[in-house]
């Protein structure tokens, strides 16, 4: 899917589910890493993470668009557009927009280091490097050592 198809999909979802038109731009932003999408308050544009579409398909993309359109329409109407606001919760429930999207990578896939306890042999996956002089095994309080550097 390209940005033109994404724009048309966003406009059609806005018309069908919200009964309001989407007058700004929706586009894929490959720099997004930890979020499915975001609504930009200044320009009123919607950015979508292309990795969400690649991994989870069009149904996940539609859910993300609905979520971001909730922010968009409430902000345009000068109502509560933040996640904590009652207006946002009410509208997102009405249109079936989820509060969160699925994570692109789980913790095990993101892990860069594997540590092993010298006492009990337990292994620990970590994204960031750990100071083995300070950190100990949570199970037996044994000494940790870097077993494997994955990436």
Swiss-Prot record:
Q: Name one GO cellular component term.
A: cytoplasm
Amino acids binding Zn(2+): 67, 71
Explain how, and how many, cofactor molecules are bound.
Binds 1 zinc ion.
InterPro entries named in the record: SprT-like_domain (IPR006640), SprT_Zn_ribbon (IPR035240), Uncharacterised_SprT-like (IPR023524)
Q: Which cofactor does it need?
A: Zn(2+)
Subcellular location field: Cytoplasm
Mention one GO biological process in which this protein takes part, according to its record. response to stress
From the record, give the transmembrane residue ranges: none
Name a GO molecular-function annotation.
zinc ion binding
Q: A single Pfam family, by name?
A: Zn_ribbon_SprT
Q: Which UniProt keywords apply?
A: Cytoplasm, Metal-binding, Zinc
Q: Where is the active site?
A: 68
The entry's family comment says: Belongs to the SprT family.
Q: What name has this protein been given in UniProt?
A: Protein SprT-like
From which source organism is this entry? Staphylococcus carnosus (strain TM300)
Lineage, broadest ranks: Bacteria, Bacillati, Bacillota, Bacilli, Bacillales
């Amino acid at each position: 899917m390209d940005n033109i198809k994404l724009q048309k999909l966003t406009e059609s979802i806005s018309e069908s589910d919200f009964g309001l038109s989407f007058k700004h731009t929706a586009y894929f932003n490959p720099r997004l890493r930890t979020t499915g999408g975001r609504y930009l308050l200044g320009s009123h544009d919607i950015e979508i993470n292309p990795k969400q579409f690649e991994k989870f398909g069009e149904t996940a993309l539609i859910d993300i668009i609905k979520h971001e359109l909730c922010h968009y329409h409430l902000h345009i109407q000068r109502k509560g557009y933040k996640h904590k606001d009652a207006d946002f919760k009410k509208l997102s429930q009405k249109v079936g927009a989820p509060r969160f999207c699925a994570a692109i990578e789980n913790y095990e896939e993101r892990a860069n280091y594997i540590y092993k306890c010298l006492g009990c042999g337990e292994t620990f996956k970590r994204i960031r490097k750990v100071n083995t002089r300070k950190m100990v095994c949570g199970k037996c309080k044994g000494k940790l050592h870097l077993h494997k550097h994955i990436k």
